Swiss-Prot record:
Organism expressing this protein natively: Brucella anthropi (strain ATCC 49188 / DSM 6882 / CCUG 24695 / JCM 21032 / LMG 3331 / NBRC 15819 / NCTC 12168 / Alc 37) (Ochrobactrum anthropi)
Recorded catalytic activity of this chain's protein: (1S,2R)-1-C-(indol-3-yl)glycerol 3-phosphate + L-serine = D-glyceraldehyde 3-phosphate + L-tryptophan + H2O
Transmembrane segments: none
Domain of life of the native organism: Bacteria
Function: The alpha subunit is responsible for the aldol cleavage of indoleglycerol phosphate to indole and glyceraldehyde 3-phosphate.
Stated name of the protein: Tryptophan synthase alpha chain
GN (gene name): trpA
Gene3D superfamilies documented for this protein: Aldolase class I
Family membership noted in the UniProt record: Belongs to the TrpA family.
Keyword field: Amino-acid biosynthesis, Aromatic amino acid biosynthesis, Lyase, Tryptophan biosynthesis
Pathway membership: Amino-acid biosynthesis; L-tryptophan biosynthesis; L-tryptophan from chorismate: step 5/5
Length: 279
């Protein structure tokens, strides 16, 4: 199968530049605002969109993304509404890849077969489910592949040579390298070590490698971009949105403008980095 993710990374490889992968939480601070953010991301320079699925017990998320998920849930966001966001986005944009990211529990409750059918119909291209290890591929990974949806795995600095083949088995779309141990948004990555890790993973796969966790500024994104096929930014975007909200999580400023300003700056830095490296 060839998905929008495969097509996008092939295009970017031909252009000689890495991808900017942008994460935000579906339904934060509300469905309408969140959908506006989603629609604005490609115009601001996002190459791939990670659409967060809010969950009440997000063990791998830092405080910012946990708070975003809570705001979304309090505003009435559901998995069905998050899928609806993808479908609405697809009415205007049929090329930007959408990756839904979150935890298995909401998908399990929704029903795996129903979820995959609805995700495919809504124009979703990939899934990142952080709490489903490769030993549980039969639960969702293999059914997703059969449905034509990429299943994207996380690798970390502690993924050793014995574990790596298991992580990569049945992976598709791209590999998400978590540049440090811990929760999202927790620290700053060591770019030299990131480069070494990416080169090591590439010995075992032809999939693009995207690096995330700890990328907050355009400068950090540019530094990571010299080593990877893509840079993932999430917490910084979530924080940009949160900065425009009042103490009750309601918009007091312009969350859409704040998010797009940041993404535009990130995109400019990421794109310039590879161009400079190619000269």
């Amino acid at each position: 199968m060839t998905t929008r993710i495969d097509t996008k990374f092939a295009e970017l490889k031909a252009e000689g530049r890495p991808a900017l992968v942008t994460y935000f939480m579906g339904g934060d601070p509300d469905l309408e605002t969140s959908l506006k953010v989603m629609k604005a991301l490609p115009k601001a320079g996002a190459d791939v969109i990670e659409l967060g699925m809010p969950f009440s017990d997000p063990m791998a998320d830092g405080p910012a993304i946990q708070a975003a998920g809570l705001r979304a849930l309090n505003a009435g966001q559901t998995l069905a509404k998050t899928l609806h966001m993808a479908a609405e986005f697809r009415k205007e944009d049929n090329t930007t890849p959408i990756v839904m990211m979150g935890y298995y529990n909401p998908i399990y409750i929704y029903g795996v077969e129903r979820f995959l059918a609805d995700a495919k119909a809504s124009g979703v291209d990939g899934l990142i489910v952080v709490d489903l290890p490769s030993e549980m591929d039969a639960e969702l990974c293999i059914p997703a592949m059969k449905a034509g949806i990429n299943f994207i795995r996380l690798t970390t600095p502690t993924t050793d040579d014995k574990r790596l083949p298991k992580v990569l088995h049945n992976s598709s779309g791209f590999v998400y390298y978590v540049s440090m141990n811990g929760i999202t948004g927790s620290a700053i990555a060591d770019t030299a070590k990131v480069g070494e890790a990416v080169r090591h993973i590439k010995k075992s796969t032809d999939l693009p490698i995207c690096v995330g966790f700890g990328v907050k500024t355009p400068e950090q994104a540019a530094a990571i971009a010299t080593h990877a096929d893509g840079v993932v930014v999430g917490t910084a975007i979530v924080n940009a949105i949160a900065g425009e909200l009042d103490e009750n999580g309601k918009a007091k400023g312009d969350p859409v403008a704040a998010a797009t300003r940041l993404v535009h700056a990130l995109a400019e830095s990421v794109r310039a980095t590879r161009l400079e490296a190619a000269q």
